[in-house]
Each structure stands twice: as structure tokens, then as C-alpha cells.
Regions:
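Short acidic-hydrophobic, aromatic-tinged amphipathic segments that line or gate anion-handling sites
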Residues: 87-99, 135
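Acidic/histidine-enriched ion/cofactor-binding microenvironments in catalytic or ligand-binding pockets
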Residues: 66, 104-105, 214-266
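Terminal domain-start leader segments
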Residues: 1-71, 107, 150, 168, ...
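Flexible, acidic/His-enriched mid-domain "rim/lid" segments that flank
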Residues: 2-10, 101-223, 250
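Short, basic, glycine/proline-bearing loop/turn elements
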Residues: 9-19, 82-88, 230-234
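Short, compositionally biased
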Residues: 269-273
Length: 273
């Protein structure tokens, strides 16, 4: 087998988002768009979390939704997208020129996600598809994702079970005098991974990803960070306001603050002790 053929190989353990789930989400999107923006013609989804919600895969590209159809355009990786997503229409793209050539015409108003879209991305889209104005649909997308299906709730329950086991049952046994903040955080994170956590927490913020979370001892938990949350940490250093210090050791009588994220197949639970 040549090295190029490895691009389409994926583990047998892959669990795809059911096609029926994707179809329901797309139908709800069109229904809400017609309510809020009657006569809409085209929406372009670029944010990877929203792309995953509607397609079941996270790639570099764009999901174009119209009243009559939806196409996932993928620059990289097309093979992976075809393997992961059950969406029927997935096509390769080189740039937005590919979309412009395919659609030929475009509406005066384009519906996009303004919260995560960069000016550079909007300019590139407009270069090849010169619409007159764009309208933000972040609020609409958030309102759709707020209402969880039974499929989504089941994944959150699985995440919560991992959270409960690790933070309530294992953490008390792992907290011992002399352990560092960083060591405790990494150890708890590792236990979550062993039990099926997907290993990252995503939040609807400009810098919205955290991997390991935070373990803080004593007054370290009062050190404010840029993250909009109740806890704090000195971090590993000034440049990384997360995880905890590898040099701050637990002493007898100090309070322990833990905020270690957990999630399963894209769905999170939040637990702090």
C-alpha cells in the first residue's frame, strides 16, 4: 500500500453521528431561518463546532446550506470527511473559487457566523462570491444547539459518569501531600482519557479550548486568569494560565481546587470540586 492510500484509513472504533440526527438538525435550521430571515437563500458555516453539529465531521472547508440543499465543501481532509460524515453530498474544494464556479450566482445577503469568522475569511468569501452584505446567524445557531436530542443527552450522561468516577472516587485517593498541581491535573486528565473522554473542552469564546484544566492548591486558586470562570491558578507560567504549577506542592491543611474538563464525542459536562 502506498503512503497516499493511508489518507483514507481510519480506526474501526469510529462512531459516526447518525444520519437521522443530522437531517433533523438541518431541518430545524431551515425552519428557524425561514422564521427569522424569510426569503433567505444561502448560509455558509465555517466554524468547526457548528460544522460538526450539522455534518458529523470537523474539517477545513465550508458547509453551504440553501433552502433546497446542503453541500459540505472540504479542502482538507476530504478523505477523512467522507469516512466520518454520513452527509450524502461532500465535495472537494481548492478555494472559494470552487464554490463560485459551482453555484454561479449568489444572493445579495449571505448568512454567516460572525462570532468566529475572521475579517480575512469574510474578505476571501466576498472576493469569489461578491455578496452585498452579510447577516450574523450565531444567535440562531446557539438557540438550535441549546435544545439537546436524546442522542446528545446520552453522550452527556456518559461524560458525566466519567466525571463523577474520576473526580469523586479517584481524586480523593490521588490527593496526597507533596504532589504538585501540574502532576495532579495531568493524572486526573489521564484517568478521564482512559475511560473515554475525548480530551478537550470547547467553549464559545475567542480562545475557547482547554485541554487539561486546572488544579490549584491554597491561595493559588484565588489568582485570577483571563478565563471567565470562578476559579483561578498561577498556571505553569505567565504564558500558560492553566493546568497548575509543577513546582507548587500540596501541604497539609491546604484547600484543593479542581476543574478538569470531560467530554464524550463532542459533548461536555462541567464539574468543579
Amino acid at each position: 500500500m502506498s503512503i497516499l492510500e493511508h489518507a483514507s484509513l481510519m480506526t474501526d472504533e469510529i462512531r459516526r453521528v447518525p444520519l437521522e440526527e443530522l437531517q433533523i438538525r438541518l431541518a430545524r435550521f431551515r425552519e428557524e431561518m425561514e422564521k427569522e430571515h424569510p426569503g433567505w437563500q444561502m448560509a455558509v458555516i465555517n466554524n468547526k463546532v457548528n460544522m460538526y453539529y450539522f455534518t458529523g465531521t470537523m474539517q477545513e472547508g465550508a458547509l453551504v446550506i440553501r433552502p433546497q440543499d446542503e453541500i459540505l465543501w472540504v479542502r482538507r481532509s476530504y478523505d477523512r470527511a467522507r469516512n466520518e460524515s454520513l452527509l450524502p453530498d461532500i465535495r472537494p474544494m481548492q478555494s472559494f473559487r470552487t464554490l463560485a464556479e459551482f453555484y454561479g450566482t449568489w444572493p445579495d445577503v449571505m448568512y454567516v457566523e460572525c462570532r468566529k469568522a475572521t475579517v480575512d475569511w469574510l474578505n476571501m468569501l466576498r472576493k469569489y462570491m461578491p455578496f452585498k452584505e452579510y447577516t450574523d446567524i450565531d444567535g440562531l445557531l446557539c438557540s438550535l444547539r441549546l435544545v439537546k436530542s436524546s442522542y446528545e443527552l446520552e453522550l452527556m450522561k456518559r461524560s458525566g459518569a466519567i466525571h463523577q468516577t474520576v473526580l469523586e472516587q479517584l481524586a480523593p485517593k490521588m490527593i496526597k501531600e507533596g504532589i504538585s498541581e501540574a502532576e495532579l491535573a495531568v493524572s486526573l486528565y489521564t484517568e478521564m482519557l482512559k475511560r473515554g473522554s475525548h480530551g478537550i473542552a470547547r467553549m464559545n469564546l475567542p480562545l475557547g479550548e482547554d485541554v487539561i484544566g486546572v488544579a490549584s492548591f491554597g491561595k493559588s486558586g484565588l489568582v485570577r486568569t483571563a478565563f471567565d470562570g470562578p476559579g483561578g491558578t498561577g498556571g505553569t507560567c505567565i504564558a500558560v494560565q492553566s493546568i497548575g504549577s509543577p513546582f507548587r506542592k500540596l501541604k497539609a491543611g491546604r484547600l484543593v481546587y479542581l476543574d478538569i474538563p470531560c467530554g464524550v464525542e463532542g459533548y461536555h459536562t462541567d464539574k468543579t470540586i
